[in-house]
Amino acid sequence: MNNILILGANGQIARQAIDMFLKETDAQLTLYLRRSSRLENVDSSRAQVIEGDVMDMEKLKEAMIGKDVVYANLAGDLEQYAKNIVEAMSATGVKRLIFISSMGIYDEVPGEKYGSILDPYRKSAQIIEASDLEYTILRPAWFTNSDEIDYVTTQKGEPFKGSVVSRKSVADLIVKLAESPELEVRRSLGINKPE
């Protein structure tokens, strides 16, 4: 049984991943978010809710103690969040990180140049890649709300094979990576629906 810390637990992908973890695995979840009142109907026998901010290093470290996997699905100051996550994981001995980023951070989307808008994603990925963590960075295509699990992955340096992906597909990959922590270690994966 894995103990998983979910940072940004109220995000749309995170909520789908939480449902999948609870239905398909025996994982124990710690749901970390700024406003806990946003989460409803959480199975308290398998999920602990912590109200906190990734900028609060002491609370973040406390939440990481005893965890096997950290899954981060955040928006905001991604560069500082990545620094804090790496520091807190190093301090608590947690090695496995699944971090959601964005397609385009390596100019891997044919015909598209996203420029400086993706700088926070690029910088956070660089911080994680420079760490000694057992990370997997996910770079999803544009999100859809389709109720489907249909995706392919690409490695860093390979062009994307599509432009969209369902949130449910991303959640499925997150659960697979968390349940099989030896998969795709120290990799940055693009994820999209095949076209």
Where are these regions (language model features)?
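Conserved beta-strand segments of alpha/beta enzyme cores
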Residues: 28, 48, 134-136, 187
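Glycine-/Pro-rich loop/turn segments that contact NAD(P) or position catalytic residues
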Residues: 76-157
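Short, well-ordered alpha-helices that flank and scaffold nucleotide-derived cofactor binding pockets
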Residues: 19-23, 27, 87, 130, ...
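N-terminal Rossmann NAD(P)H-binding glycine-rich loop of SDR-like oxidoreductase domains
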Residues: 4-24
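Residues in the short beta-alpha loop(s) of Rossmann-like NAD(P)-binding domains
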Residues: 10, 35, 103
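NAD(P)H-binding glycine-rich loop region in Rossmannoid oxidoreductase-like domains
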Residues: 4-5, 31, 36-91, 106
